[in-house]
């Protein structure tokens, strides 16, 4: 006959204990505080059980009693139970205080570990902050739709009247595709001589000139 396979971890042992002693151990719901000396009772009851060693049984019991669920159950005045669920001695204040201190310390360690893990992953927060709304494009600094609209409503530049066609008048002259600011320096029959803001002097026809807008 083959030997039964031994348990390999505390989880398997705790599941086994909850099935074998359901009035004492559990894996869900509220835990029950265990009788002092429960390990000796377990060692006697499981003496013929080949699947669990005493070493693994001891570590599994320590794992069970250090769980938050179990520590919550250790309150002053509550009764401990034996393997059959029978009441044993009540929990003393000293033991209850110790359990609460263990619980708070354990929770603090978990919170600190979680905080360290979050701090080690700044990429997640950074990528979240750097997301842009795909439906809209940001406007250049200092401009927005309200600033752009008035420019589209401006009337076209005026042609020069005979009175304005004199030296000293500020104009714009169309050279290439873009109008350039200039000042009339001389008017003759064959054209108008203007000086660009760049300092260049050119002669153009009157039709290429427009009255410069007054600066506000």
Swiss-Prot record:
GO terms for biological process: post-transcriptional regulation of gene expression. SMART domains: ProQ. GO terms for molecular function: RNA strand annealing activity; RNA strand-exchange activity. Pfam families: ProQ (PF04352), ProQ_C (PF17516). Residues 105-159 are annotated as: Disordered. Gene3D superfamilies: ProQ/FinO domain (1.10.1710.10). GO terms for cellular component: cytosol. Residues 105-115 have a biased composition (Basic and acidic residues). Its main location: cytoplasm. Keywords: Chaperone, Cytoplasm, RNA-binding. It is found in: Cytoplasm. RNA chaperone with significant RNA binding, RNA strand exchange and RNA duplexing activities. Belongs to the ProQ family. This is RNA chaperone ProQ.
């Amino acid at each position: 006959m083959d030997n039964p396979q031994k348990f390999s971890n505390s989880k398997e042992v705790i599941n086994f204990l909850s099935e074998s002693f359901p009035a004492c151990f559990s894996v869900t719901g509220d835990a029950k505080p265990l009788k002092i000396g429960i390990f000796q009772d377990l060692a006697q009851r499981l003496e013929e059980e080949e699947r669990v060693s005493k070493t693994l049984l001891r570590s599994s019991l320590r794992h069970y009693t250090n769980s938050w669920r179990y520590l919550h159950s250790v309150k002053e005045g509550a009764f401990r139970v034996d393997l059959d669920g029978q009441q044993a001695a009540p929990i003393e204040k000293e033991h209850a205080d110790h359990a609460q201190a263990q619980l708070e310390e354990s929770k603090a360690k978990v919170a600190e570990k979680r905080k360290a893990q979050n701090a080690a992953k700044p990429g997640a927060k950074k990528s979240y902050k750097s997301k842009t709304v795909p439906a809209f494009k940001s406007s250049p600094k200092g401009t927005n739709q309200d600033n752009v609209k008035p420019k589209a409503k401006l009337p076209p530049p005026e042609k020069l009247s005979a009175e304005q066609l004199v030296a000293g008048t500020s104009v714009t002259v169309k050279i290439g595709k873009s109008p350039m600011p200039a000042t009339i320096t001389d008017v003759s029959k064959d054209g108008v001589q203007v000086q660009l803001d760049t300092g260049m002097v050119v002669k153009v026809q009157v039709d290429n000139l427009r009255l410069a807008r007054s600066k506000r």
